[in-house]
């Protein structure tokens, strides 16, 4: 598995991942618009050239709001979500982000565990 900053060509795969993982997914267009804005930061996890997970944040001054963490159902329970979160925080720290937030639903045990 390789975790890296998201590349523009990965956006269609990330949009497909959103469709699988969320009841109110980001659209491909929404992802493209956010990707183009400097206050957004995204990382992806890939296996054999396929995106199996991604995470994103929105930066305001020195704070980062983690917007999404998604992992394909078939790739879950392998630590990918945790690895994505760590990579996102490390990339955020490179941008002088010093505080990170992540809102989770009460029943989302996987997100709470991160």
Region roles according to the model:
Residues 71, 105-106:
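Short amphipathic helical patch at the helix-1/turn junction of helix-turn-helix
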Residues 66, 99-104:
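Conserved hydrophobic beta-strand within the GNAT/NAT acetyltransferase core sheet
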Residues 82, 98, 107-114:
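Conserved active-site alpha-helix within GNAT-family acetyltransferase domains
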Residues 29, 103, 112:
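Conserved catalytic-core motifs of GNAT/GCN5-like acyltransferases
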Residues 2-74, 78, 82-95:
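Acetyl-CoA-dependent GNAT
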């Amino acid at each position: 598995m390789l975790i890296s900053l998201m590349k523009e060509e990965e956006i269609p795969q990330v949009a497909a991942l959103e469709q699988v993982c969320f009841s109110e997914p980001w659209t491909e267009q929404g992802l493209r618009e956010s990707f183009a804005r400097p206050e957004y930061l995204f990382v992806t996890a890939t296996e054999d050239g396929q995106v199996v997970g991604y995470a994103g944040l929105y930066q305001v001054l020195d704070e980062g709001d983690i917007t999404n963490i998604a992992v394909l159902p078939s790739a879950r329970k392998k630590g990918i979500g945790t690895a994505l979160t760590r990579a996102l925080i490390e990339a955020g720290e490179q941008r002088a982000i010093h505080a990170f937030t992540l809102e989770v639903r009460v029943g989302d045990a996987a997100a709470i565990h991160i």
